[in-house]
UniProtKB/Swiss-Prot annotation:
Annotated family: Belongs to the cytochrome b family.
Record organism: Otospermophilus beecheyi (California ground squirrel)
Cofactor(s) essential for the protein: heme b
Ranges that cross the membrane: 33-53, 77-98, 113-133, 178-198, 226-246, 288-308, 320-340, 347-367
Name assigned to this protein: Cytochrome b
Annotated disulfide bonds: none
Length: 379
């Protein structure tokens, strides 16, 4: 009799995706982040569900309801901090996952890469709306500043902003709709993840060498299931250390002050994972220009498959490209630091230089270096 996992319509899908899936034998720990992102999404949906049971999306009671969760609900403080810091872990895994894709040339799987970029945008939108929900000072002013950016769109800008706000300022209507969107988007993300995996399994995984690995495949289970469990345990360990020892390390103290439209915080800044984009936004002294640069900083990921001029797929055997890649990483860390600094000398000029370098490396230097490497190898 054939095994049920190979015949049952539902089990068959699971079997082909997680058990009998042929996987390259040499994929490194950098390939763990896909499963870790799945784990992060699961943690966020579960903790978010329990938070939603006690949260009220009304301007009068939102802040109090979060306080109530932390003080009165059984382990409410734990659920809330796992959710808040889980978002940080989510973005750490996201950035490492994208970085892996760039380094090893995984972006040559067009559909998988493009769905991944859509996922990145949707996760960023979800995180932004989630940050507004506690209705602290930084929630309110962050929502005001970021939604206001849409007013830079010519002709329809102001109408669009007021339509999103549901009034003439960020108020009850805004909070209610942000809660609704924040609740629904993770399920849309889950659907997109399935599409992402569907396209990935059409081609199979890439591997560190960037070479075709059809001649050397091993079953996903037990080899990579065990490897993924190790990654999951380490992720949970780091998350719980963060949650139990310094839950507010990555947060902003201003968000412990209830939202007050009459008093602006001295430094309005988003959560750490948006700081690089925020720095690029601020480095251009024009509203529309800044917004375009902000969107371009993520959309530029779409250009990687088009600008891949090297004869090799992976950067594993391309030392010059490796150097430029790590300079790009350092540049992004610099932008993240600048995004959290006040708008004054010398931070303004550092931010502008880092922003220029970011776009220059991706659009000019990396393709040029690829061509030089081709020449050096007489290809």
């Amino acid at each position: 009799m054939t095994n049920i996992r190979k015949t049952h319509p539902l089990m068959k899908i699971v079997n082909h995706s997680f058990i009998d899936l042929p996987t390259p034998s040499n994929i490194s720990t950098w390939w763990n982040f896909g499963s870790l992102l799945g784990l992060c999404l699961t943690i966020q949906i579960l903790t978010g569900l329990f938070l939603a049971m006690h949260y009220t999306s009304d301007t009068m009671t939102a802040f109090s309801s979060v306080t109530h969760i932390c003080r009165d609900v059984n382990f409410g403080w734990l659920i809330r901090y796992i959710h808040a810091n889980g978002a940080s872990m989510f973005f750490i895994c996201l950035f490492l996952h994208v970085g892996r894709g760039l380094y090893y040339g995984s972006y040559t799987y067009f559909e998988t890469w493009n769905v991944g970029i859509i996922l990145l945008f949707v996760v960023m939108a979800t995180a932004f709306m989630g940050y507004v929900l506690p209705w602290g000072q930084m929630s309110f002013w962050g929502a005001t500043v970021i939604t206001n950016l849409l007013s830079a769109i010519p002709y329809i800008g102001n109408t669009l902003v007021e339509w999103i706000w549901g009034g003439f300022s960020v108020d009850k209507a805004t909070l209610t709709r942000f809660f609704a969107f924040h609740f629904i988007l993770p399920f849309i993300i889950t659907a997109l993840v399935m599409v992402h995996l569907l396209f990935l399994h059409e081609t199979g995984s890439n591997n560190p060498s960037g070479l075709i690995s059809d001649s050397d495949k091993i079953p996903f289970h037990p080899y990579y299931t065990i490897k993924d469990i190790l990654g999951a345990l380490l992720l949970i360990l780091i998350l719980m250390i963060l949650v139990l020892f310094s839950p507010d390390l990555l947060g902003d103290p201003d968000n412990y002050t209830p939202a007050n439209p009459l008093s602006t915080p001295p430094h309005i800044k988003p959560e750490w994972y948006f700081l690089f984009a925020y720095a690029i936004l601020r480095s251009i002294p024009n509203k529309l220009g800044g917004v375009l640069a902000l969107v371009s900083s993520i959309l530029i990921l779409l250009t990687f498959p088009l600008l891949h001029l090297s004869k090799q797929r992976s950067m594993m055997f391309r030392p010059l490209s490796q150097l430029m890649f790590w300079i790009l990483v350092a540049d992004l860390l610099t932008l993240t630091w600048i995004g959290g600094q006040p708008v004054e000398y010398p931070f303004i000029i550092i931010g502008q230089l880092a922003s220029i370098l970011y776009f220059t490396i991706i659009l000019l230097i990396l393709p040029a270096v690829s061509l030089i490497e081709n020449k050096l190898l007489k290809w």
